[in-house]
């Protein structure tokens, strides 16, 4: 079994792993990759897909669960969902609330357990590693 000591190097490896997962997900799901590329510029902070699309159980009736730690342009993101034919369910935490409550909020472990980061990997990893 391998382990990493906490520090800059460990955070860098974890950030690279998150980016690699995003690349793999985009290759496996080109339709969602296009959606992500339109949503990412509308987010200031970290954008995280979780739920059925992240764990591979989504079907044609599934919405896209998107968590934002920071700010985003809600109406534009919802419009993108309508254009592509599925609802986008947004959960938004101001960055300071995410930073403070990451390990105490009962909702956030679901996001941490199974997710695909579409933006802001460094901040997300830095806070999750604490």
Language model features with spans:
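Catalytic core of pol beta-like nucleotidyltransferases
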Residues: 1-45, 54-61, 69-130
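Glycine-rich beta-strand-to-loop/alpha-helix junction loops that act as flexible
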Residues: 50-52
